């Protein structure tokens, strides 16, 4: 399935979600992430600060920020910088995303677990992002466990057409499914 068709279909499905459904899905997905060894064992975790149309990470960030070292991406040209998450030091950055202030840049190689946002995933861990390649470029330099999260309809049955630069995730978690990529 072509990436642009997937982006259109997922956008339409998202627009039908109620606030209640959004909250329930986020709770269920992050409850399961918490119980996974990959999360329990990891201390340095790259999260994302959710946009309104993404599975919300707000509650989860708040719940665990005292016990894990969370990091967030910050757009820097065509690349993503990685900085520590501190609730008091966020500003609205590129694309209206809340991003960390300061210059405490962290090496991607020091991150143990990455929660990777996407428009959709297939059962092989392939992903469709927002089409700017930010995560693909960053993930190319990482050996961390990569976890995709989303609503049920963001896990699609058809295989996604991949390009050579696409980096798959190891695990996809949705409300009803946990998919582990075969290696
Ligand atoms: N929460 C969150 N943070 C993230 C990402 C993400 O997908 N989600 N990113 C993942 O890469 C990076 C930012 N990349 C982004 C790329 C495009 C758009 C976006 O809104 N695109 C519009 C098109 C508008 C335009 O071209 O200016 C769109 O999708 O409709 C947002 C973020 C880093 N931080
Ligand atoms: N490692 C890379 N090096 C150079 N260019 C890249 C790399 N990865 C992706 N790109 C470029 O980024 C653009 C978008 O790629 P693609 O459509 O796969 O993004 P995406 O997976 O939807 O986005 P994202 O990775 O931000 O979630 C393409 O033009 C691609 O050539």
Predicted regions and their residues:
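Conserved residues at the C-terminal ends of beta-strands
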Residues: 48, 117, 175
């Amino acid at each position: 399935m072509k990436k642009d068709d997937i982006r259109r279909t997922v956008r339409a499905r998202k627009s039908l979600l109620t606030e209640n459904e959004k909250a329930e899905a986020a709770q269920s997905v992050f409850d399961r992430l918490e119980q996974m060894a990959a999360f329990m064992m990891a201390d340095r975790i790259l999260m994302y600060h959710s946009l309104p149309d993404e599975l919300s990470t707000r509650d989860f960030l708040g719940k665990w920020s005292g016990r894990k070292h969370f990091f967030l991406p910050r757009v820097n040209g065509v690349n993503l910088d990685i900085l520590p998450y501190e609730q008091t030091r966020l500003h609205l950055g590129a694309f209206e995303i809340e991003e960390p202030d300061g210059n405490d840049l962290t090496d991607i190689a020091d991150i143990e677990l990455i929660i990777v946002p996407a428009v959709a995933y297939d059962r092989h861990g392939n992903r469709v992002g927002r089409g700017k390649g930010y995560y693909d470029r960053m993930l190319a330099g990482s050996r961390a466990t990569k976890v995709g999260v989303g609503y049920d309809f963001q896990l699609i049955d058809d295989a996604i057409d991949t390009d050579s630069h696409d980096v798959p995730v190891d695990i996809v978690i949705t409300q009803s499914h946990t998919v582990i990529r075969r290696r």
